[in-house]
């Protein structure tokens, strides 16, 4: 299945889901404020999340030994909830 992401513009929620494998998921932003998942390698369906229109980022690692990180090197991100799921996970907030 790999990592998938969807954005609900009406609620401002960006949801990211891993699978049963060992996933590395990194949320970040570019200088213009676009929110990126794995540096833009994961396409976001449903809209274009930015720091201006996103109220919450939810990341669900699910099974496997996941590494989930919020990288704020390019500026602050919206609030985020990180859920590792089953496995030995590493969660790092911004």
State each model region's role.
Residues 1-94:
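Acidic, glycine-rich low-complexity segments
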């Amino acid at each position: 299945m790999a990592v998938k992401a969807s954005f609900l513009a009406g609620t401002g929620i960006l949801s990211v889901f891993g699978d049963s494998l060992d996933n590395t998921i990194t949320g970040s932003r570019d200088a213009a404020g676009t929110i990126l998942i794995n540096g833009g390698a994961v396409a976001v369906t449903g809209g274009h999340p930015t720091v201006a229109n996103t109220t919450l980022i939810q990341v669900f690692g699910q099974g496997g030994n996941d590494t989930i990180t919020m990288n704020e090197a390019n500026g602050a991100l919206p609030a985020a909830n990180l859920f590792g799921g089953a496995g030995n996970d590493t969660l790092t907030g911004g």
